[in-house]
Amino acid sequence: MKKIVLLLAIVSLVKSDQICIGYHANNSTEQVDTIMEKNVTVTHAQDILEKTHNGKLCDLDGVKPLILRDCSVAGWLLGNPMCDEFINVPEWSYIVEKANPANDLCYPGDFNDYEELKHLLSRINHFEKIQIIPKSSWSNHEASSGVSSACPYNGKSSFFRNVVWLIKKDSAYPTIKRSYNNTNQEDLLILWGIHHPNDAAEQTKLYQNPTTYISVGTSTLNQRLVPKISTRSKVNGQSGRMEFFWTILKPSDAINLESNGNFIAPEYAYKIVKKGDSAIMKSELEYGNCNTKCQTPMGAINSSMPFHNIHPLTIGECPKYVKSNRLVLATGLRNTPQRERRRKKRGLFGAIAGFIEGGWQGMVDGWYGYHHSNEQGSGYAADKESTQKAIDGVTNKVNSIINKMNTQFEAVGREFNNLERRIENLNKKMEDGFLDVWTYNAELLVLMENERTLDFHDSNVKNLYDKVRLQLRDNAKELGNGCFEFYHKCDNECMESVKNGTYDYPQYSEEARLNREEISGVKLESMGTYQILSIYSTVASSLALAIMVAGLSLWMCSNGSLQCRIC
């Protein structure tokens, strides 16, 4: 009879209704790193590091770049004859110059403060070229004879288009005294130069006067130049050299020019009609007839990601450059799908695995939820409220990171002349240091956010578990794997009340108490039965062993193998 009662109790336990709390799992192989772990597989992740570009030069926010092709900035501004296509240029978003353009200073020489001029251009979007001293106004000097084979055009000697190389006329070079008043509302970029002859013979041949000077003055400039006559190696067939200068003439200011030889006078100036964010970018790429918000020398980036690793020099609304190769942000949960387990031959049916043992691939409509089983069947149901709150929280966090990083950011290369190499090296070291720090900060940010996200999901599952536990109290048993086993019958309506937080504890408490006491009694009685059987088995085994030893002794005495003496 006792065995029958025990069997019925076990059968009733097997058929007990259950509800489990768990989380979503899928076939994702996405992995993220956290502060504590590496290569954590998650259900969902978002890559926040852009690694691709289109390999083209594009318009920036609809404004075309000024691509100088084979011309340098100096060749463009002075008017190298091979750069005639850039005589008048429209508004530009940025300037593109090759690393070693063929059409630079056709007549050999230097451009004074060239790097500073390029820096100035990085804040300008449009020039308007205007004539300030007409070439025809030099009646006492030869204004058309100043040409060179070093600057050919259509097979003939020519010269820079925007300046005039003044030569003596009728064996005389009268002293020049000219001034120009800037009546425009905009600043003017004005260029001029000086010729350094190869020897004294060339000096008098071109300028008549053996000793000459050039004087240039504005409200902020006071310059006096003298030619440096010296024998030099030929470059582009020329032993002479030219040195060019520039200044910014403010509105209502005047520039005063005075010279008695070797003067390369300004004819055209550039009116700065629009200032703004620009850049001079070194690139060999061609124009791609495309539009972008972010341009690099390697190509355009069209991405909403907060970081990129394409090139440290950029122009436009660009992600932050980092040296990392991988930055992946966790948006989902740890992905640990439930493993199938073999059913044991005896014992209770294993509960559906909850958040301790693994996730559920069967729950596809939410991140957290329930699995129930009763006489009416079984099934999964997502907890929509906690899932939606979690989705909103993670989405807001990702968007916040992207918005913070996707700001107007320009990082263009700085150029230094030969006398500033130590400064250039120091600048590179500082920039490399900044990039290292920024890369470290970005990687640390991702690791910390991933740790917080996964902890956030774990906390949400625990909160859902506690919500059920506080409702059921002693009406159900905690199985230790995210599941509860009811001490009472719980149909679908009862299950739904647990899920939505309206479970009526008093309604089921009496039935649960009776079943709980019955199960406890069965356990105690079965334990006593097992103890009696154990004692009986021990005594019986000992008695059987004693009988076997006595029988063996009598047999050995009878055949003489053992001597028996009775005293």
UniProtKB/Swiss-Prot annotation:
Residues 1-16 form the signal peptide. Disulfide bonds join 20-483, 58-290, 71-83, 106-151, 294-318, 490-494. Keywords: Clathrin- and caveolin-independent endocytosis of virus by host, Clathrin-mediated endocytosis of virus by host, Disulfide bond, Fusion of virus membrane with host endosomal membrane, Fusion of virus membrane with host membrane, Glycoprotein, Hemagglutinin, Host cell membrane, Host membrane, Host-virus interaction, Lipoprotein, Membrane, Palmitate, Signal, Transmembrane, Transmembrane helix, Viral attachment to host cell, Viral envelope protein, Viral penetration into host cytoplasm, Virion, Virus endocytosis by host, Virus entry into host cell. The record marks 346-347 as: Cleavage. Palmitoylated. In natural infection, inactive HA is matured into HA1 and HA2 outside the cell by one or more trypsin-like, arginine-specific endoprotease secreted by the bronchial epithelial cells. One identified protease that may be involved in this process is secreted in lungs by club cells. GO terms for biological process: clathrin-dependent endocytosis of virus by host cell; fusion of virus membrane with host endosome membrane; fusion of virus membrane with host plasma membrane; virion attachment to host cell. Its main location: virion. Glycans are attached at residues 26-27, 39, 181, 302, 500. It is found in: Virion membrane; Host apical cell membrane. GO terms for molecular function: host cell surface receptor binding. Homotrimer of disulfide-linked HA1-HA2. Belongs to the influenza viruses hemagglutinin family. Binds to sialic acid-containing receptors on the cell surface, bringing about the attachment of the virus particle to the cell. This attachment induces virion internalization either through clathrin-dependent endocytosis or through clathrin- and caveolin-independent pathway. Plays a major role in the determination of host range restriction and virulence. Class I viral fusion protein. Responsible for penetration of the virus into the cell cytoplasm by mediating the fusion of the membrane of the endocytosed virus particle with the endosomal membrane. This is Hemagglutinin. It comes from Influenza A virus (strain A/Chicken/Hong Kong/37.4/2002 H5N1 genotype X2).
